[in-house]
Amino acid sequence: MEKAYRIKKNSDFQAIYRRGKSVANRQFVIYMMPDKGLTHFKLGISVSKKLGNAVTRNRIKRAIRENFKVHKDDMLPRNIIVIARHPAKDMTVLEIQKSLEHVLKVAKLFNKRIK
């Protein structure tokens, strides 16, 4: 995913945590906050060291990024932070995709109906 789609600064993460709204399921927590200047979404991913070693954490992050890449044109322009919870570490990429799509639908972050 291009740099324009990323949230990197700690201050940006903290602002979204403080002022954003959250939606969660068993595997993921989504924090979202609208931003007037955005023409597309921005994504930040957080996977705790408690979830496993670097290989496991990076696999989860890759699966999350891939899901957002697939739905890049379907997303509303928002700042989004995805936090992976413990059950996500034992899931396949397809299961991660389904779970993430579910929580994104609940958060109403799609600009059109996704099957």
Curated annotation (Swiss-Prot):
It catalyses: Endonucleolytic cleavage of RNA, removing 5'-extranucleotides from tRNA precursor. One of its GO terms (molecular function) is 3'-tRNA processing endoribonuclease activity. Signal peptide: none annotated. Its EC number is 3.1.26.5. Belongs to the RnpA family. HAMAP family: RNase_P. PANTHER family: RIBONUCLEASE P PROTEIN COMPONENT. This is Ribonuclease P protein component. It comes from Staphylococcus carnosus (strain TM300).
